[in-house]
């Protein structure tokens, strides 16, 4: 084929970005988690709008494309969110949104069971899909469950369950 009929890359059009992956699991969120998603959407939207309004926006198409992609992902997450009312959760067993204090041979720890996008190990906020949360879900105070970890199974006892407002976490 003649090279005359082949479009040469001109460098002006950015490569199309792959979409950010969306989870196949239900998008359960705590009230705090939904507020965080909405705040992140607003901040990203404001950054995108400011970039579009700037005189240099033509030279920053890659950054604009990244922001647009993130906004599509955030929009999907906000619209698919299933907000869980923590006060309506059964207070006597571990369910989504619970703050659970556990004791083990490694000491006492407190974890909050949250949605996928809220999980933050450094804050002891674990996804409801994690092995720890799966071990705890349904447990009552005094129950001992086995947390299956890569480092080895650990027996943990539930010593407290709390669904108090998590804004102080």
Where are these regions (language model features)?
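Active-site phosphate-binding and catalytic loops of NTP-dependent enzymes
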Residues: 79-90
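Amphipathic alpha-helical dimerization/oligomerization modules
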Residues: 155, 159-168
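Helix-rich terminal scaffold detector
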Residues: 1-77, 166-169
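Generic alpha-helical propensity signal that fires on short helical segments
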Residues: 22, 45-47, 52, 118-120, ...
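Short, intrinsically disordered, mixed-charge
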Residues: 43-46, 80, 134-141
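Non-DNA-binding regulatory cores of transcription-related proteins
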Residues: 88-151, 156
């Amino acid at each position: 084929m003649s090279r005359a009929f082949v479009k040469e890359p001109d460098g002006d059009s950015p490569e199309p970005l792959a979409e950010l992956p969306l989870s196949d699991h239900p998008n359960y969120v705590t009230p705090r988690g939904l507020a965080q998603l909405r705040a992140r959407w607003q901040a990203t939207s404001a950054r995108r709008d400011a970039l579009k309004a700037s005189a240099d926006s033509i030279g920053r198409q890659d950054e604009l494309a990244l922001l647009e992609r993130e906004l599509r992902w955030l929009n999907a997450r906000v619209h698919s969110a299933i907000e869980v009312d923590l006060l309506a959760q059964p207070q006597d067993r571990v369910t989504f949104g619970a703050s659970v204090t556990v004791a083990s041979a490694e000491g006492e720890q407190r974890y909050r069971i949250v949605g996928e996008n809220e999980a933050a190990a450094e804050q002891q906020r674990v996804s409801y899909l994690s092995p720890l949360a799966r071990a705890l879900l349904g447990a009552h105070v005094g129950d001992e469950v086995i947390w299956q970890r890569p480092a080895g199974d650990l027996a943990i006892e539930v010593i407290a369950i709390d669904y108090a407002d998590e804004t102080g976490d």
